[in-house]
Structures are given as C-alpha cells and as structure tokens.
A protein has these predicted regions:
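Catalytic center-proximal scaffold of phosphoryl-transfer enzymes
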Residues: 1-192
Length: 192
C-alpha cells in the first residue's frame, strides 16, 4: 500500500496514507461481500467452469492468482498456495459440473469432477510433441487436432447440431486411432 500511496501523491497530487488506503480497501471489501457470495454461488452451480492460476508476487512473496470463470462471472482469489485445496474451496465440495483447465494436477486429481481440457493447452502440447519428436505422424496428429478444434468452434457458433455431431465423430475417431500408438506422448494426449 505504500507504493499505491506514492502513486496517488505523484500522479494525482492526492495525499492518502497507507493506513487510509487499508481502511478504504476494508470498507470496499465489506460492501462487495454480498456480490462475491452471489458470484461464488453462480460459479459453484454452473455446468462448465474454466479454471486457471498464475504466479504473482504479494508483498515480495510468491503467490498465485486463481480464477474460476463461467460465461457470466469470474471469481478471483489470491493465495500463497498452488495446492488443490484452493480449487476445491473455490468450486465447493458439491460441484457437479465440468472443469475446463490445463493439465495441472490440482484440477485433474479430483476424480468426481468431469474434465474438459483447454483447447489452447491441448494444441500447444500436440505442437510441442510434433516439434520434439519430428515424427510425421505426430505432425499429422497435431494438424488434425487443430483442424477439428477450428471446425468445432465454427460449429459451436453456428449452433448447427449436425455440424457439432460431425466434429464429435471426427474427434472420437482421432482419439481412438491406433495409428499413433508408436508415439507414447501422443497416446497420453489421446487419453486425456
């Protein structure tokens, strides 16, 4: 808060003490509490929740900014931990929806959660496998995966049920294909 106090003084010629800022933040937190409860309830009862976390510094200490978001709301939380308990607390013990995330174990270890992995992370992983192995089949897998995701986005926007079903069939075929069985990393990605 000392830095914020200096910014107000330097940039806006407004004098506010660090303790004054702390009091302001506490009042704002109290006012926002009902909205936070409403957002938590919405997230915990949603059918699909995207989750992610990123490293930040808090008072010089390593911390994580956590995000649980739906199409209508975003719930943020700062913790000094990257442990699975944070995700569990954010979603609540009775969460029954789908968690869309990267491959981090805090999300995948919850057996009762259904998982929908983030398309960008999945494509990035497939691309990395193709680059590292240099195998033509790994490249082919990555290209097909990208194509299916692109087609899936178009089908989702169009709302056409037949198009979405076609994309599902293509994905099922790619996931079930044994053509890539000589590539353990591709096989691992297929199982996800």
């Amino acid at each position: 808060v000392h830095g914020v106090s200096r910014i107000f003084a330097t940039w806006f010629d407004v004098r506010v003490t660090p303790s004054g800022l702390c009091q302001l933040f506490a009042r704002q937190a109290a006012r926002a509490a009902p909205a936070v409860v409403e957002i938590e309830r919405h997230v915990r009862t949603s059918g699909v929740v995207g989750m992610d976390e990123t490293t930040i510094r808090q008072n010089g200490d390593l911390a994580w900014a956590w995000l649980a978001r739906t199409d209508k709301a975003s719930l943020f939380r700062i913790e000094l931990s990257r442990g699975a308990w944070v995700a569990e607390e954010m979603l609540g013990k009775d969460f029954k929806g789908i968690v869309c995330s990267d491959f981090y174990g805090a999300y995948t270890r919850m057996g009762e959660w259904e998982h929908g992995y983030c398309n960008a992370h999945t494509i990035r992983e497939a691309k990395k496998i193709a680059e590292v192995t240099g195998d033509a089949d790994a490249v082919r897998f990555c290209e097909r995966l990208r194509s299916i995701f692109a087609e899936g986005q178009k089908a989702q926007v169009s709302g056409d049920a037949d198009e979405r079903e076609h994309v599902r069939r293509r994905m099922d075929y790619l996931i079930g294909s044994t053509r890539f069985s000589h590539l353990p990393d591709v096989t691992r990605l297929q199982r996800r």
